[in-house]
Swiss-Prot record:
UniProt entry tagged with the keyword Protease: no
Annotated segments matching region Disordered: 251-320
Function: May play a role in viral cell to cell movement by increasing the size exclusion limit of plasmodesmata and forming a complex with viral RNA to assist its movement. May also have a papain-like protease activity and cleave the genome polyprotein.
Similarity-based family: Belongs to the tobamoviruses movement protein family.
Pfam family, one: MP
GO terms for MF: RNA binding; serine-type endopeptidase activity
Identification of the protein by name: Putative movement protein
Ranges annotated as biased composition (Basic and acidic residues): 278-289
Active site, per annotation: H144, D171, S199
GO process terms (BP): proteolysis; transport of virus in host, cell to cell
Amino acid sequence: MAIVNVNHFLKEVESTDLKIDAIASSELYKDATFFKPDVLNCIKRFESNVKVSQGQGDGLVLSDFKLLDDTEIDSIRKKSNKYKYLHYGVILVGIKAMLPNFRGMEGRVIVYDGACLDPERGHICSYLFRFESDCCYFGLRPEHCLSTTDVNLAKRFRFRVDFDCPQYEQDTELFALDIGVAYRCVNSARFLETKTGDSGWASQAISGCEALKYNEEIKMAILDHKSPLFLEEGAPNVHIEKRMFRGDKIRRSRSISAKRGPNSRSKETRGFRSLSARIERFGKDEFGRRASTSEAPPGRSVSVEDTDRPGKGNSDGSSP
């Protein structure tokens, strides 16, 4: 199951305020139509833009980064009396290079469940990105729902991103990372089908990315704990789009700057962490083997061509 039409997405993504807005709600859920404004209004969007700065010539790692901020989590929990489940319709990851001679540079993104104590069972997907243009993109559509009352809701989707990083002066911003999500609260899995009738797991290498299989290197990366870089988060942004005959379209985003702080080696906080060796020294096997298009290994990381997708969800609740 393809999540997006690649040509259409690449055309739209550069003309939107938020990258996640390049994917229409109607592509994610079959009941998200012009004739159902209540459904369109219940689909929320949130995006994080992170500027990654160099630190003393080391490679850089974004580790244990959470998908939603506290405001989004609080909003979801306030709806728990009305809705039992949370579903992510799509998670979009974009990596942008902001330096010369970027072509051929590589890195890796690992998505995992931060509440799972077994890294293999908690692994969601991994991608190798290689810059052939200045931007790389991939998307994933989880099959499972989450509980709106889960005390560990903020941990359930976490990210680790390894960047190949040449030597630059301290605090030079070299990469931008955009992680956007469209989600909705529901009471029934039957409302989670796309307009083509699919409801199973999907991930898609949209541009400059290849899926990786779970292996020992990915396991150690998930378990890795190193001193983080300093995270400086700015005030959240609210994007409002006026619409005729419907309520205003409201989305939220946040901007984060990641750089080496004065206490980055001694103070343990969540966020970016320094890497002792540059990623370009890693061999292909250390990044992880590319995922087969017909294989779904434990801790799945499969491409959209996988023909053995899980079945559709069952109807067991009411419409949002």
